Every structure is written in structure tokens, then in C-alpha cells.
Amino acid sequence: YNTALRRETQDILANAFNSDDKVEFTTYFSESTLARTHYTVRVTDNNIEYNVKDIENNLIEAARTWEDKLQSALLESAGEARGNELNRKYCNAFARSYKEEVLPSAAVVDIEKLEMLNDDNKLEMLFYRPQEEASSNIVRLSLFHKDEPIHLSDVMPMLENFGLRVVGETPYSVKTSDGGINWIMDFSMLIDSKGMADFDKISARFRAALTSVWANRLENDGFNRLVLMGGLTGREASILRAYAKYMRQIGVTFSQTYIESTFANYPHIAAKIVNLFAKKFSVKSPASAKTLEKLGLEIYAELENVANLDDDRIIRLYVDMIVATLRTNYFQKDAEGKFKSYISLKIQPSLIPEVPLPVPAFEIFVYSPRVEGVHLRFGKVARGGLRWSDRREDFRTEVLGLVKAQQVKNTVIVPVGSKGGFVCKQLPSEREAFIKEGQECYKIFIRGLLDITDNIERGEVVPAVDVTRHDEDDAYLVVAADKGTATFSDIANGIAIEYNFWLGDAFASGGSVGYDHKKMGITARGAWQSVKRH
């Protein structure tokens, strides 16, 4: 018995008997645990019809506590055995503020999410439109986190980069009977009307993308707005992001922020550009040249509605870059059957007007949230090292300068030069961890190169797996050590052997079974193997 129950009882009786007067009450307390309340309802019509059973049911329901209703909801949802187990764990877990805002039936959904949390999965979420606000642009996000609350300074930029405007946030701690403490953070947000169409489908994509951002598998930037505004997946948005990173390296003056705003203004064009890329490199059914030309013309037709010349130039450059792209590993999967966490693009830079001189014959650009790298090659038979660069903004310029110098040196060794470089984007400050991260980034870079390079088996060229090729056979890829990678050659050769690459431990010079290139005047044994085949 409490005041809230007494007031609700008064309301039920007043409504049942259509009374406008205040319902009077007297409460009697005894030495037992029970209390008795006598109510007096004054009515103007003694002949009013009423249903005693309905009144009793309403009073019984009113007397049930939030915890009682939670138990019933858990039993109905999970069955008797599991429901009772969850009830024992969660019956006293929620704070009063939570119970005042959340219905017991909704708490069951939250409990299901809380039960998914463990040491390997510390974040779960719900993203939904409240029924009572279905006609507005309000959406809700509930984040469930194990052990500790999420810092607003961490999550707010992520949500804003998805184009969401946070208008309210409420944290709740959940203290279970087994001593565990988890947290629920409930956000109210405004979403652009473009993101309201087919909300269920977009919701699933948003949850997957936000989970990837939280785990550092997806970058936290404005390209993520296209998940809600353009209907892209987080991985599809990474296609546009990868090309934006490449644009930066070839000296295009537009900032990434400006490119992001261009596509935010024209999300339907962003979707068409991604579709052009997907159709060109689809493994199952790559589009014909005629179809690709038609898709390109459709994008150009959209430019009639693009008023800003800079936006026009950016969109045209994206089409140029996709046309110039010869191969990608975008549709490859790893040993676990998941799409790879990095994107490799083999590009013919002579087809891109913005590329500075000298223009390589081919280049491979590797992008991931952890590492970016480029491998420039001025011919099919080329040699050169891979450098661990610290010039994140212009490492391609550094590599291009090195390869020009290499070409002069190579006139007495191998006809043309090549050079590669990569930058690590999430380097820790501790020395040992710093080196380890550098090695892991190097591995990603090497895998990115090998993913889209053909192999040779029994003297025959074997095309790269799950790669749609828009160029001739190309199985020539040799690397060497350079600044920062002097001790990495065995790592590269190990990956080459893992890929069953035809050069094996000749892939990278300087390893434990490679040649001493300084003594012998060569950079890579593999380069000579390539010459033999030419």
C-alpha cells in the first residue's frame, strides 16, 4: 500500500461511477502486514450501470507493482524456467527513474539485450521510432554497455557523423543480483527526413555501421551520413571514403569534409556512384561496358541539378577514378567468410586528369581504418622497396619522389622503377606496441597488394580470386625493404607463402632466405624472376 496506489484507486472508482466529487477514503492499519482502505464515492445518479468484475480487475491490476508486471512479462516472453531465472536476476536491478519511464514489457526487450553482453561483446543497441512519435522525425537509440557507462564525448561525435542531432540523453545503471553492473544510455534524436524512408531496413544498416565505428572497423567521419541519408551500408560508404583518401594523395585541393558535404547534399548521386563501382566489379555478374557507360551517363545527367561547380567537379572526378580503377578486392572474403576489413584498388592513373607527373603505369592504393598505402609501378617489370612513412597527408608524394630517384638507379638493373609506402593511423605511444602496430599495418598493406595480383601455377597465369579484372594478366609484384621496414621482409615472404604466391620467399628481398641486395647490387631476387618470364 502506498499513496500512488490509493490515488489510482480513487481515479478508478470515480471513473467507474461517473463521479465528479472527490472520492473520500479512510485507511486502517493493523499489526499485521495488511492495510484496509474504505472508499466513499458520491454519485448524482443512483441508477448508474456498472460492472463489478471490471472494477475488480482494474483494481487488481492497479495494485500490481512494476516488478510484478515485469515478472509476468518475463514469464510470457521466456517461459517459466528461464523467465523465473531472469526475474530473480533483474527484479531489483532497475532504478526508480528507469521504472518511471519504461514499461515492464519494454524492459523485457532491454533485458534481452543486456543478456547478450559479455567480455567479447561489450556493446548492444536498439534503434527505433517510438510509436507515439511516428509522425515526427524523432528516433530513439538505446546503447547497452558492460561494466561501465559510455562517455558522451566518445559517442556524440559518432552519432553526429551519422547525421543525427541528439536532443536528449538519459543514463540508467542496471545492478543485477549476481553483482554485475551494466549501463543503458537512452538517446532521443532528430533524423533527416531522407532517413525516414524504409526505416526498418535503414535501421539494420545503421546498427551494423555504428557497431563497426565503435570497434574501429569503420572510420568515424561524415561519410557515415550516407548510411541514413543515402541508404548505403557502412562498407559501401567506405568505397567513397577510400577514393577521398586517394584524392588527397594525388593533390586534389578539396578537403575530405567538403567532399562529405557534397555527398550529404546529393545522397542519391552518392548511391549511384557506389552502384557504378559495384556493377563494374561484381564477381557474380559484372556489367558490360555498354551498361557501365549508361550508368556513368545517368550520373552525369544528375549534374544538371548540381548548382555548385566544386560539387560538379568532385562528382565527375569520382566517375573518372572508378573508370580508371582496374581491380579491387572489395568482394573478397577472409577465411571466416567475412568481407575483408580493407579495400585495395588497382588504378591506371593516366586516366585521371588530376594525377601529377610523372604518372605511373599502375598503382595500388590500399585503404583501411588502420593503414593507408600506395604502390607505384612504372612498368610491368619493376623493383623497389616499401617504406613505413610518417607523412600521413602526402605519403604518395614522398613515394613518387623516391621512385623517380629509383628509376635513374635502375637503368643498370631493372628497366623501370616501383616504390611503395604506407602510414599507420592508430599508432600507440608505447614503443613495443608501436612496432607491433607497424608490423600489423605492414601485413594489411602486403595482403592488399597480393589480393589483386594474379598468380602463376605450373607456368600458367591464375587470376586473383574473386576479382573482376579490367586489365591484362599481371602476376609481377616484387618488393624490398626500405626505411622502417628493414626487418619486415620475412613477414612479407610469409604472407606470400600463405597466399601460395608464385615467387614464394623471393617476393621480398632482405629476408632470412633472400639475397643480400647491397652486396649483389640488386634489390629483389623476384625482379630477376620476372625478367626471365618477360
Residue ranges and their predicted role:
Residues 1-164, 168-372, 380-393, 433-437, ...:
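Non-catalytic interaction/regulatory segments
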